[in-house]
Amino acid sequence: MRRHMVCAVMGAIMATAGWSQSLTWLDTQFNPFTVPLGVSADGSVVVGMTESFPQQSRAFRWTRALGTQYLGTLGGNASAAYGVSANGSVVVGWAHDVNGQRRAFRWTAATGMVDLGALGGNQSEARGVSAEGSVVVGWAHDVNGQRRAFRWTAATGMIDLGTLGGAESEAWAVSADGSVVVGIAQDATGEWRGFRWTAQTGMIALGTRTFSRDAHLDVSADGSVVVGTHTPWRETAFRWTEATGMTDLPLPSGASVSFAYGVSGDGNIVVGGVDLMARAFRWRSSGEMDDLNSTYANLIGGGAMLWLATDVSPDGRYIVGVGMRGVYEAYLLDTGFPRRGDVDRNGCVDDADLLRVLFAFGERGYRDEDLNWDGIVDDADLLAVLFQFGSGC
């Protein structure tokens, strides 16, 4: 089968595209404070919240084609979007109902906002969604009004993930296939700790570092890398793996605090900020770090600044965050790397990339060869290489 496919693809007409970088300031209709919290795999969809008055935030979904779309509420006056599926079609977050209670929602163009319920209480929030949009995680009140981390699917509804021996927990992110959930939970002493949950292990503490309530965590595609911000003495960005434990990310000279908000699919790129929204930063597992304001100064221009990076696409190419350009504005940064179709990320779309897709053809799972991040290596991924063949070489 692969031999026939090779013959077919080698006979195809190749198209070459250039390598480009860009910075887009999102038009959210002049709201003075906009926070993007999620970006799709190809950078074409951004979700988050805008706020013009206290308690009047609105969940939004922005696309390159249509601009900003407000997703509404569940009958109340406020909402916020926290996560988006890989293809941008599923959005999750919270919205006020008619009683002013926060309720976790899952949105699609076909269904609109759907209330996901709670765990016996009145309120809930969705914080993360799996790559294909079928698994949602967050927190919900139980019958005692305590926050409990949940994992939701259409088949199971909300499942309480428990705690680390204390009263409350919150889930923040989920792996691409929905099997690994990360967040924070109280231990028996009432301290908040980071956790990693699977159906096999249950909730496992990430170590002894403490966290503030509502501390943000993110997880790599396969669930093996967790990033976030721990306390107590000062906010410090970290990267966790089972092999290394929790490792603090380096600080640039003169900085005192750091925040990590997003991680790439392979776990090698972490984005966030340093010094209380002063500079958007990017860290790499190799130890390199850079201030996005310096690296992309030619795109930003005078008088503007990238304050914070809040999410990064699975391949690490697209970064969203909050900047200042007279008012707080959301931005979408296209770093230009990796090129579309560049499976091995060496800057050149060539035979090596083509062969990797061919030999992985039909395989399921979120991997480098799955270029469109839909969970299977198929024709779409093959075409992505073909249409960019020769780029950068």
Residue ranges and their predicted role:
Residues M1-H4:
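Positively charged n-region of N-terminal signal peptides that target proteins for export
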Residues C7-A17:
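Bacterial N-terminal signal peptides
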Residues G18-P338:
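Conserved "turn/edge" positions that cap or connect secondary-structure elements
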